[in-house]
From Swiss-Prot:
This is Glycoprotein NB. Keywords: Glycoprotein, Hydrogen ion transport, Ion channel, Ion transport, Membrane, Signal-anchor, Transmembrane, Transmembrane helix, Transport, Viral ion channel, Virion. The gene is NB. Belongs to the influenza viruses type B glycoprotein NB family. It comes from Influenza B virus (strain B/Beijing/1/1987). It comes from the Viruses.
Length: 99
């Protein structure tokens, strides 16, 4: 007498359907968010200019720059973290050399 065996005919079809619906909703939500993200990225990229908000000289990594492909900026590849302009508004990150 083994009570641990699982009989697949006793699976509740309602709970099975409910689980499938939840998984489908989660996957659909993820796909919709991804599509909206790409659409928003395209709109933001089209609205960027090479001198966005006039802060390019003061802060090289402005908030819009990672989404824009600047063809005139052929400097060395950027490394590190992009610093949005609204986080450090008073900091001068121009090409300065330490003492």
């Amino acid at each position: 007498m083994n009570n641990a065996t699982f009989n697949y005919t006793n699976v509740n079809p309602i709970s099975h359907i409910r689980g499938s619906v939840i998984i489908t909703i989660c996957v659909s939500f993820t796909v919709i968010l991804t599509v909206f993200g790409y659409i928003a990225k395209i709109f933001i990229k089209n609205n960027c200019t090479n001198n966005d908000i006039g802060l390019r000289e003061r802060i090289k990594c402005s908030g819009c720059e990672p989404l824009c492909n600047k063809r005139d900026d052929i400097s060395s590849p950027r490394t590190g973290v992009d610093i949005p302009s609204f986080i450090l508004p008073g900091l001068n990150l121009s090409e300065s050399t330490p003492n």
